Structures are given as C-alpha cells and as structure tokens.
Amino acid sequence: MCGNNMSVPLLTDAATVSGAERETAAVIFLHGLGDTGHSWADALSTIRLPHVKYICPHAPRIPVTLNMKMVMPSWFDLMGLSPDAPEDEAGIKKAAENIKALIEHEMKNGIPANRIVLGGFSQGGALSLYTALTCPHPLAGIVALSCWLPLHRNFPQAANGSAKDLAILQCHGELDPMVPVRFGALTAEKLRTVVTPARVQFKTYPGVMHSSCPQEMAAVKEFLEKLLPPV
C-alpha cells in the first residue's frame, strides 16, 4: 500500500486482511467496547472476498463511565445503553472524524468511496452508522451488528445528502441483554427515515445474545458480495 500511514493514526497498527487478488474494494470494520480489531479481522477472514481489503482499527483506551470509569478500548465514552441515555456528543463526533480520515486515506490510494463499506459490532457498529450517515463521500453501505444509531435525535437532519442511497445491513440477536433487540428495531425505523427505506435490511437471530453467529456472518458475506462485486 502506498501513502503515508502516519497521518492516519488509526491505520498505523490496525489489523488488516489483505486481498488475495488486486484490491478494488475495502471494508472498514470497527470492534465493540473493550475489544480490539484482531478478533474481527479473524472473523472477517473466514468470509473474505479475494478483491477486498479488510481494515479493523483498534479504538483508543479511555475511561468509560458505564464501566465505573475503567480504562479500556472505546471509540467514545458511554454513559448508558438505552435510547434515552445521555451521550458523549463531542467524543462521537471526534471518533467519526478519525474514521472519515481513514476512509479518505483509502480513497487517496485508489479505492473509490462507492467501493468502501463501513461496518462494526456494538459500539463500533454505532460509530459506523453515525460516520457513514454524516460522511461527505457516498459510501457503498454499512454493516451494523448488534448496535444503535448515536445522537439519533439529530437525524435525519444531520445526515449528508448522499446518505439516502446507502445500503444498510442491520443484524441483532433476539436475546441480546446488552443492547436489546427492541433498541435495534427502533434504530431500523429511524434509519428508514434517513436512507431509502427499501435499502435497510433488519435481520434478527433467535437464541443469539450480544454476539455474532454463523448465519449472521453468512448474511454479511452475501451483502458484501452484492455491494462489492469484482470489477
């Protein structure tokens, strides 16, 4: 890869899965609270497409209010996990700018915005939704797993005009004790006011808690195959 990674801090030690062929598309995937990019790089490598590069950055370590101010990998501070919980607006916006810098780095290296999918799990999925909806570049789509839309009251007004064409795959475990599936359903409703409603898929998985499952990963692979075909 050409270009200077030093100007994009999240790229310097990100876990990546390189394409087996010439890379013509990219998936940027953001992990959940307390995790690192390595676990999702491993998971995505099991469904990899040969022409796609997968980039899984690591969140900075910060004190998290929800976890008694313990320092852990977190994209922004979390005060609670409910639709009415107070939110770290400045932290969310700063994190989104850092992800946009990563997107722009890939664009400078020859991958067009419409060949980039942003995704994530839990807090990472939340950040991927907020970032893609407010991004000035028209991305291909979003993979949003077990998550919610941060600062949801700001939408649809906060969305960039190009966001209406985004394809969104939203998946949720029906027994999720951390981010209840009802919160996911409310998020899907809100997303349909921001993007073309038919472009939002909301899939739920019986018996699944706050985690992924093989059926969900198969759905992610199918979604990526449709959005990012070989060129």
Curated annotation (Swiss-Prot):
Organism name: Rattus norvegicus
Gene: Lypla2
Lipid attachment residues per UniProt (S-palmitoyl cysteine): 2
Top EC category: hydrolase
Annotated GO CC locations: cytoplasm; cytosol; Golgi stack
Any one GO molecular-function label of the UniProt entry: lysophospholipase activity
Active site annotation, chain numbering: 122 (charge relay system), 176 (charge relay system), 210 (charge relay system)
GO terms, biological process: acylglycerol catabolic process; fatty acid metabolic process; prostaglandin catabolic process; protein depalmitoylation
Post-translational modification Phosphoserine, affected residues: 82
Domain of life: Eukaryota
Protein's cellular compartments: Cytoplasm
The entry's keywords: Cytoplasm, Fatty acid metabolism, Hydrolase, Lipid metabolism, Lipoprotein, Palmitate, Phosphoprotein
Catalytic activity: S-hexadecanoyl-L-cysteinyl-[protein] + H2O = L-cysteinyl-[protein] + hexadecanoate + H(+); prostaglandin E2 1-glyceryl ester + H2O = prostaglandin E2 + glycerol + H(+); 1-hexadecanoyl-sn-glycero-3-phosphocholine + H2O = sn-glycerol 3-phosphocholine + hexadecanoate + H(+); 1-octadecanoyl-sn-glycero-3-phosphocholine + H2O = octadecanoate + sn-glycerol 3-phosphocholine + H(+)
The protein's name: Acyl-protein thioesterase 2
SUPFAM superfamilies: alpha/beta-Hydrolases
Family in the record: Belongs to the AB hydrolase superfamily. AB hydrolase 2 family.
This enzyme's EC code(s): 3.1.2.-, 3.1.2.22
Role of this protein: Acts as an acyl-protein thioesterase hydrolyzing fatty acids from S-acylated cysteine residues in proteins such as trimeric G alpha proteins, GSDMD, GAP43, ZDHHC6 or HRAS. Deacylates GAP43. Mediates depalmitoylation of ZDHHC6. Has lysophospholipase activity. Hydrolyzes prostaglandin glycerol esters (PG-Gs) in the following order prostaglandin D2-glycerol ester (PGD2-G) > prostaglandin E2 glycerol ester (PGE2-G) > prostaglandin F2-alpha-glycerol ester (PGF2-alpha-G). Hydrolyzes 1-arachidonoylglycerol but not 2-arachidonoylglycerol or arachidonoylethanolamide.
